[in-house]
Amino acid sequence: MPIAIHTGDTAWPSGLLKYSHPLTVDEAAVAFPDVTFVIAHCGCPWFADAAEVACKNANVCIDLSGLVEGNPKPLMLLERQRGFLRQLHTWLNYLGNYEKIMYGSDWPLVNIPLYIWMISHVVPECYHEDVFYNNAVRIYSKIGKLLEKCGG
């Protein structure tokens, strides 16, 4: 069973960032090589560290949930977040293994159609089916079994 670990910024002033940094997942991944770990939120804002931890450890994947919040207009989102999205794109390419990357929304904090649109502009189109569906079904194998039962 995979273990998803919250990484990245915390919503609470009393939360300690050292415990939500993606490098903490490296320690767990090395100690438990038979467990699959998912770095939630791609370690935002520490994309480089999250990508390196996933690159180094065969048992670590990344989800792209909760990277933006709210309901901005698409062009406004691209304009305001251009540097952020460019950085995310750079580090996903550094990882170079789109089989380790999954879509995630962090709903209800985001507008789902807008979020899908944003992620589709960061992930190369040839990997969309894997990132938006196949990887989650493979990594969270119980989901695939449930979908089969439902005919999906």
PLM regions with names:
Residues 89-90, 94-102, 108-152:
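Mid-to-C-terminal alpha-helical segments outside catalytic/metal-binding sites
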Residues 1-102:
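Catalytic pocket-lining loop regions of alpha/beta-barrel enzymes
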Residues 67-69, 107-110:
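Short Gly/Pro-enriched loop/turn and capping motifs at secondary-structure junctions
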